[in-house]
Regions:
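Active-site-adjacent structural elements in enzyme catalytic domains
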Residues: 6, 13-14
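Short loop/turn segments immediately following beta-strands, especially the blade-tip
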Residues: 23-27
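Glycine/serine-rich loop-strand microenvironments at binding/catalytic pocket rims
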Residues: 1, 81-101, 224-226, 230-232, ...
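Acidic helix-start/capping segments at beta-turn-to-alpha-helix junctions
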Residues: 14, 36-42, 135-143
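Proline-rich, low-complexity linker regions of envelope-associated factors in Gram-negative bacteria
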Residues: 177, 181-252
Length: 252
């Protein structure tokens, strides 16, 4: 893999895991490294409103302007919440970050050590010409078994929609094109032009409604995430990530 090749980030709340995937020379993405999430606030499920202490779930774009090397939490980047899907449902919130440290109010806290490496990988990709990094944030690994274990959860229609995007990525090993119409995500739409997030989907796109109207959380109180499994370790043995991390230490 080239040092400045594009990257993609995947987050799984229930497994307390953030993954960095990197593009190989064939244009496909492969898992580069996994990091334990030190803390996220809230429960499984999307962020709905300012002050609900939920960490977001969904598909987001990170651009160079969202990078913050001067964060009070060491290093950070903004997740991009709310995106077009969130706004179409009236969801509110701001400054939802992936950052260092181990304190979270609606964010994903990764520890300073891990964040140094994650931030460096994203920064190097931008220096290599990547315009935006796709962030895929999930409640858990989107397997049929995991969905079945959460059957009856009111967020299930939303999670089934996220699974469609997750499957699109894992099948092609490339970031899916993400659009929004009819207040729902659509992936790899075979159309030209922009879609109206609040308008019905055009012909040729399945318009079966999936995401329902905005509803309050059953509980807005923060809860501690599940304990780490202990199967994920850092620092990584990957030489690209190690060198980027070392360069960051010299800068910051």
């Amino acid at each position: 893999m080239d040092r400045t090749a594009p990257v993609l980030i995947r987050i799984y709340k229930e497994e307390n895991t953030l993954e960095v995937w990197k593009q190989d020379r064939n244009g496909k993405f492969a898992l580069l490294n996994s990091y334990p999430i030190c803390k996220f606030s809230g429960n499984l499920g999307p962020k709905l409103m300012q002050g609900d202490y939920q960490a977001p779930e969904g598909f987001y774009d990170i651009t160079p302007g969202q990078m913050n090397p001067n964060s009070s939490e060491y290093l950070a980047f903004n997740t991009g919440f709310p995106n077009a899907f969130d706004r179409s449902l009236g969801r509110t919130g701001s400054f939802l970050m992936v950052h260092g440290g181990c304190q979270s109010v609606g964010c994903y806290a990764m520890t300073d050590y891990a964040m140094e490496e994650i931030y460096g990988l994203v920064d190097e990709a931008f220096k290599g010409g990547q315009e935006k990094v796709q962030l895929q944030a999930f409640p858990f690994r989107m397997t049929t078994q995991n969905l079945a274990s959460h059957a009856g959860d009111p967020n299930m229609p939303f999670w089934e929609m996220l699974k469609a995007g997750s499957d699109a990525f894992l099948t092609t090993e490339r970031p899916p094109t993400v659009a929004v119409c009819d207040r729902r995500y659509v992936f790899n739409p075979v159309i030209s032009g922009n879609l109206d997030p609040s308008a019905p989907c055009p012909l040729g796109i399945d318009s079966t409604p999936i995401a329902g109207p905005l509803r309050p959380l059953q509980s807005a109180s923060a809860s501690a995430p599940p304990s780490n499994s202990g199967t994920i370790a850092y620092p990584t043995d990957d030489p690209i990530a190690q060198q980027i991390s070392e360069n960051l230490r010299k800068i910051y």
